[in-house]
Amino acid sequence: MTSHKKFLNNYFDEQSSCLRELSNNTTLLELVVEKLLDARSSDSLVITIGNGGSASTASHFTADLLKTAIMKDQKRFQSLCLTDNIPVMTAWSNDISFEEIFKEQLKNFIKKNDVLVAFSGSGTSKNIVKALELAKNSGAYLIGFTGMSGGDFNEICDICIKVPSTNMLTIESFHIMLCHVITSCIRQTGTPEFSYE
């Protein structure tokens, strides 16, 4: 039987290294939490997008905002994930192009002071970048979660959270963890409606 010990040790070493780097600078994460709380207070829409594994992260984050982040005696988040409506996505992809699937959906919803949260391991996905550009021109606030060099997210996003890794699996793992960190931080601002302890 082949031993996987070396690989597993190296894998966990990389995760530990990424976690140390992220935990040493939480300033951007604090800004994300504050921006989301502002959006909740003003009834602004928080829209999430992503492709592949990042699509599932986007959907998961919206689910957490809509339920896990419910606080007693406070407004609820208004949130929408654009990867959740498969018929609409395939309609735009089939009739126009895959690059337009998020941009065209945003035209139905996005307005000034809304928040667009984009997930992309590379920060270069064309359909994501096009959506960010439209949202920026609409006066929305842009939050990007990425990795590697950060790609286009570095320039276009108001806040760019970059996982310090070139491994896509590691990047995606940390994106969902960061979403849970943000949700947990929001839950500390009052009395959560639901207990998960």
PLM regions with names:
Residues 21-42:
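A short, well-structured juxtamembrane/interface segment
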Residues 83, 120, 146, 161-169:
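Short beta->alpha connector loops at strand-helix junctions that form conserved
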